């Protein structure tokens, strides 16, 4: 039996019924075969439902990693926060006039990455150091890591 299942966007473009069936199948395969699963997805709803630990990537680099509950309760990296705030959460007809939040700008080309933090050009919190140096992934809270100078400094204060 395989020890690892790598599922790359297994629920993309599927309706919620089929999506639930796919996630159930992955879960049962995991349990039946006692294997690990790496689930690659852009769907935060799938992450919230199916993941235990999560790593958020931006422009090919991990910018935050944590267990899923901590990540959704307290996103530390501005990109993660932007992703969470830009998804529809319990929208109803009453708030149909509200616009979803967006992350300004565009993802940089992997051939022309900025010299500092890859998210710095789109980040509302970016400082000079963010544009000059690449932040390392550091433990900000127990078991919760982020690659962000601003989050690291805020945790120290």
Locations of the language-model features?
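P-loop NTP-binding/switch modules centered on Walker-like glycine-rich loops
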Residues: 2, 6-10, 14-96
